[in-house]
Amino acid sequence: HMPFNLVYVDSPHGGMDGGCSSAAGVPEKGINLNILLNLRDLLSVSGYEVVVTRDTDRSIHDSGIEGIANQKSSDMDNRLAIFNERSNAVCISIHQNQFTDPKYSGAQMFYAPTNKDSERLAQKLQGSFHTRLQPDNDREIKQCGKELFLCYFSKNPTVMVECGFLSNPEEAARLTDEA
């Protein structure tokens, strides 16, 4: 049992950074943002305090930063700062997966070994996806390293949720429609 009353929800990719795109050309950033807004509302009515990293299609990089790579780095630093503002919280970063073969589908959770509760949170989320949304999903949670910056450096239990594969046309259509 992880006692917490605050949920940070992150929608990566915003502004100039669209993330990956579905076969139909729908950018990841819009799908992530729509899922974030729905999740924020659901968690709020369930009694949780929710803080989001963005609620519009924008980058949250520091002003005056030039160049896409520098803006993306600043955006990541600022999102991490939001995740680390308070303790007694859990953090969820919403992403969409993509692979060269369109046959792959299903949500998958990633966590870093830097917080022992991150693995438990990933297991709970993966289990909920399996039970409530994707009974055929047999994906396992995966440990990540520093390449998943927010997961690795967050002080709170943090999970990156890959909601599905935009490279799978059926799943991409569902993610776009349901968002």
Predicted features along the sequence, with ranges:
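Peptidoglycan cell-wall recognition and remodeling modules
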Residues: M16-A23, N70, L133-I141, P157, ...
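Catalytic-core regions of hydrolytic enzymes
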Residues: H1-A107, Y111-R120
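Active-site-adjacent substrate-binding region
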Residues: D117-Q143
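Active-site-adjacent mobile loop/cap segments within catalytic or ligand-binding domains
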Residues: S93, T100, R139-A179
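A structural motif corresponding to the C-terminal end of an alpha-helix
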Residues: L39-V50, R132, F149-N156
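Short, surface-exposed, charge-dense and proline/glycine-enriched linear segments
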Residues: L80-N88, Q126-S128, F165-E178
